Amino acid sequence: MNCKIEFMSFLVMTSIVILFLFVSGKVEAEPQCIGSCEMLADCNTACIRMGYLFGQCVGWKTPDMCCCNH
């Protein structure tokens, strides 16, 4: 019985470590687009208010999406 408890504890701890390794790479904030630049008066200020370091309008032909980055 004691051996079963130790084995189950080992499995739980191993699962937690593996889960942490998978999740830790995704914790860093990725660039996020928050809306169109037409709707936001100042893209950079809107991003800073949301906790990002800066923001800029991006797009292929016309920069019309406000995207924030850390």
Swiss-Prot record:
GO BP, sorted A to Z: defense response to fungus; killing of cells of another organism
Keyword annotations: Antimicrobial, Disulfide bond, Fungicide, Plant defense, Secreted, Signal
Main location: secreted
Cystines in this chain: C33-C68, C37-C57, C43-C66, C47-C67
GO cellular component terms listed in the entry, alphabetical order: extracellular region
Signal peptide: 1-29
Protein localization: Secreted
Recorded family membership: Belongs to the DEFL family.
Name used for this protein in its record: Putative defensin-like protein 73
Native source organism of the sequence: Arabidopsis thaliana
Gene: LCR44
